[in-house]
Amino acid sequence: MLRRKILAFTSAVAACAAFFCLPAAAADFTCPYFSLPLTGDWAQQRMQPGSVPPNTFATLFASRKAGEGVLITVIPSDKAPKEAAQIMANNYKQQGMRVLGNPVQIPGQNAYRFTYVSTNNKMHAIVFISGKGKHLANVSILGRHGTGGLALLKGLTSKEDKLFPKF
């Protein structure tokens, strides 16, 4: 089940590669899982219908100025973040992505991160996997450097204890 959701999520990432072409108005974003102040030119993007599996929450934010996107996905799962991160890294490898090392634990947190580069070397991503029992959060920063996405995520406030890592 998790493998299917991760594959569907990966397909959603690929479908979102053109995220800079779908502008939406900038404003603070809030949902059942988190709130996030959208600073600068960061804006929520529309997700393609059918790109997100049932019972999964996903939203994409993009900044033309930073040349980056942030994809946040929350799925119901009781898998440990370590196991989920390894499954996801293996799935990216099977799809031909170049995963740079194994997922590593973020010090002092039940959260893991890894990076990958697309097969054509045009898309770089930093992936964070975290959760606490009933949900897993996957936060992917898409773009060359990741600094703009990390700066945006510093403002994220989780509504579920330890669902997201501290950025």
Regions found by a protein language model. Give the residues of each.
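Short, well-structured beta-strand
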Residues: Q109-F167
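Stable alpha-helical elements in mature extracytoplasmic
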Residues: L38, A84, M88, G148-L152, ...
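N-terminal "mature-domain start" segment
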Residues: A26-P54, I106, K159-F167
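Hydrophobic core
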Residues: A14-F20
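Soluble non-cytosolic domains of exported or imported proteins
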Residues: Y33, D78-K82, G143-L150
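Bacterial N-terminal signal peptides that target proteins for export
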Residues: M1-V13
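Conserved polar/disulfide-associated segments of primarily extracytoplasmic proteins
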Residues: Q48-A125, S130-H135
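Sec/Tat signal peptide C-region and signal peptidase I cleavage site
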Residues: F20-A26
